[in-house]
Every structure is written in structure tokens, then in C-alpha cells.
């Protein structure tokens, strides 16, 4: 295909502003979908966790044909925790579609991804989505985006961006608010008009950089990337250059191009197209493939440094090995090494002992998604409290800071301001919307924000919205940051929980276990209503006596116990506690069983 007929774009947006839905509609509009796929929602989010959480974790590629052109589209994650994915993707495209919600306007994570796009010199197209929402205010959003681009230092070309109004859910778009067409055609036409075709030379020797990896058991590793120059055919001999500039020979088996959601084998691919290749073992992200005649490496892709670390260790609780398939340190090590191949923002180092691993990532969500996928694969492990990664700069300790945006009802403002003060946050901006809600912007040290989310929901009675994104490394704030105020209820025996004893423990705090569960000594069974830890016995039965009771036993009614997701459990625990993760349970426990 002639490079002049190709357009490469990435879709970027804050989480939940409708990227993946937009891609669905573009696929349907262009007639690229199979009949069986029509009607299913968010087709791009193919992995189980993505469907459940309603977020995109992995960047994915698809391609649509429109008016004899091929548009390669990459759907990127909106969470800053998956920023490693975003940066690699932007190296493959020539422009970005910035999708912004018509009510919310640009959010912190919109800023994060847009900044990356501007650094690469990409020109944006603004799509104001969800214009059918009640309270939509597209003109205000347009002003906000303009201000954002200005703050990010956009050049004249980037500031003069085209705008299109759309409702991806209804599949309609238009160049003017008053002139919305019946379908997505205006958006596709705008992409052909505004996005420049790849600036490449097909006559030069072949060269491409791997910016994503995939694998299947049949062909092994699949490398995805954009051909920088030249042409590529199956069975071509190439030289692979890794990040350390070591060279080795390789042979390409298949060359596949994208068509809709399918990968289609092609006889030849030209510069400017995004392709998948197979046949080369041990490929890594950032590797350069080139023609043996002219060996030249492309500059390696940069990825942000991790900011949070936690220890993964072998599960050593009394219930170890009861419901997991993979329980040894060797199993955990192999799984983490396999994850490192495709998860570029992850780091794994040996821990204090041979059965512990220090795993670092971009944030709590990044690591909890990894733990959840290991748990589903049948792993058992113990995980420690997340810690922030500090650096030393010119003899001074620096720690990561986050930009926090909080949207809440005015009545909760006082308690949140007080709480953020205890966490060493600085208020940067405050915007009332005139309808009883207020938007607060803070810069806060990351260590103060660990464990804040669940507390925040309690303080705002579930009505607050909190979004955070990594901002910078700066000199560490002095003093301790506030942590959990209450102690915990710790079981002092092993056995089955009984409703008689749980009923009596309810006055002592909130319970984490229900009736009839197996527990062990040292397991945390509840949150104490005071600030000290309390050993309790949830297995105690009612003493039977031979004296007839007047009337009957009272009917014991237990209030519903609290169940934690992995993120909530990681936020809850303190330094002397662990989260035990197995395929069927998430338990909290003390590190030592003697107390």
C-alpha cells in the first residue's frame, strides 16, 4: 500500500471519557467489523480485568479502511499508572485524537498524555465527546483545552487545532454543534484531511523498532511496530539490535497487517505501516530490526521511572497451598520475569531473602492489576504495604509528588481540606461550579496518598471524585504522614468462625469475616473501634448448661462484614501486616504469628 494512503493516529483521553466506545463506532461505521462482532460493546477491551474494571490497561492496535485509505488506530490507556504503554504507542503515530468529555473537560490524566504527545511533536485533533449528556458545556470545554495546551507550551501549529463534536455512544459527529450528522463520517474525513501521511522513504534499506509485544503458543513472540523506512517481506533476513547495541541475526516468518480487529498476513509491507512480525525469539521492546546491508539502531524508547514498590513473597500462612496451583518462589520468579517482557514500566529486584521479590511500578493500580492477573492464573502470594521510591539528588532525598484533583459537594470541603493538610498536601486551585459542588487541586507527596482513596469515599459519603497523576520528584517533606487511625482485631486461635462470638465482637468494631469461615491465628478479622490492636477469639461457641432457659435463644443478627478488593486491602494494611492473595480469597494478616 502506498504510504500516502496511510494515516496513523492514537486516541488519548482521561479514563472513562469514551475512547474505546469511539473506536467501536468507527469500526462499525467503516464496515470493517465482522457480523458476529456487531452489537458487542467496548470490543477493544478484550482482557477480563478490562471488562470488569471498565478501563483499558493494554494499548491495542486496529485498522479501518475509509475512502481507499487505511487508518491505523491505537487505543491507549487513560490511567497514568499505565503511562509506560502510552509512551511507546506515541512513537508509532503521526497525530493524536484528544477525546474530552463535554461535561468534565480536561482532567489531570488528559494533561499527562497530552504532554507526552507534545514532547513528540504530534499535532492534536480535539474531539468533544458525550455532547448528549445533560449539563454538557462544549464551549467551556474548548476554552479549557486551549488553556491546557497553552500551559503545556504548544507551538502555533498545535494551538490551531481542529475541533469535532461527537456522541460516540449514539455514533454521531459533526464539525459544528448545530450541524451534527447521522454518523461518524465527519470525524473520519477530518482525519484524512488533517493528519499528514507518514513521512518515510520506501527505497531506503529496511528499518523498524519494536514498540509492543504479544505472544501466542503457536508462533511464539509477536513484535509490533511501525516500519521506519524500506520494505519487509516474509522470510527476509534481518539484524536485531538490542538496547545495549548487541547484534544478532534473525529471519522473519510472517508479516501481518491490521484489518479491523484481525491480523492479516501480507506478502509485503511498506514504510509507514504498523505491522506485526513473527519468527524472532527473545524480542524486547525498543529493539531495532534492520537490513543486514545497513545496520543502524534507532534511539531507545524512554519510559517513566517507577514510583511505588512492594514486596511479593511466598505465601507462608497456615493455609498456604490449599487452593493455588503455583506457590513456590520459583513459580513467582518465572511469572514476574515473563511479565517484564511486555510490561515495560515494571521493575523486579531480589528481596531481603530468597523467597521475596521487590516489585516496582507506576502506581498502586499498575501493581494491583498484576497481582489480580497472577491470582487468576492460580498463584498464591503474600504482598506487603506499598512504599514510595525515594531518590537522592545532590545529597538531598527527593520523593514523588502527585497532582490531585478532587470534585466534591461543598458541605464536605472542610473535612477533606483538613485531611489533605495532615497528608502534607498544598492547595493550588479552587473552583466552585455555582451548583453546590467545588473542584480542588492539590500537589501532595505520593506517600501521603497511599491508602487515602477509601477514606476519602467515607468522608464524602461516596459522592466525591478523586483523580491523581504523577507530577514530579521534589525534596522530601519533613515529618510523618498520617496513616490508619484505628487498630485491628486479630484472631488468637485457628478454627471456624461462629456467629455467637462474631455477634459479641460487633461492638468492638467492623468485621472482615462472616460466619462459618476457616481462619488462623494472626489473621486480621476486623477493624477495632479504638487505636490499639486487640486479640480476639471469633471461634468461641456458646456454653451449654443443663438449666432450662426461660424463653428461647435470642435470634443473632450479624451486620454484613466488609470485603476488600486487592486495591482496598493494599491501602488498608500497615508495615507489620500482609495481604495474602490466593485464587479464591484475599485475607489480611500480621507478618508474625506471635503477638
Regions found by a protein language model. Give the residues of each.
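P-loop NTPase switch module centered on the Walker A-proximal segment
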Residues: 1-100, 104, 144, 213-216
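Residue-level signature of catalytic and energy-coupling elements of molecular machines
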Residues: 16, 22, 54, 75, ...
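Conserved P-loop NTPase nucleotide-binding/switch module
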Residues: 86-100, 105-149
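Switch/connector loops and helix/strand junctions flanking conserved nucleotide-binding motifs
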Residues: 35, 107-108, 133-139, 171-176, ...
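Conserved short loop/turn motifs at secondary-structure junctions
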Residues: 10-11, 127-135, 172, 176-180, ...
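Accessory interaction regions appended to the cores of large information-processing enzymes
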Residues: 162, 189-193, 197, 223-595
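Short boundary/loop segments of OB/S1/cold-shock single-stranded nucleic-acid-binding domains
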Residues: 196-197, 209-217, 394
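Canonical P-loop GTPase G-domain recognition
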Residues: 123, 133-193
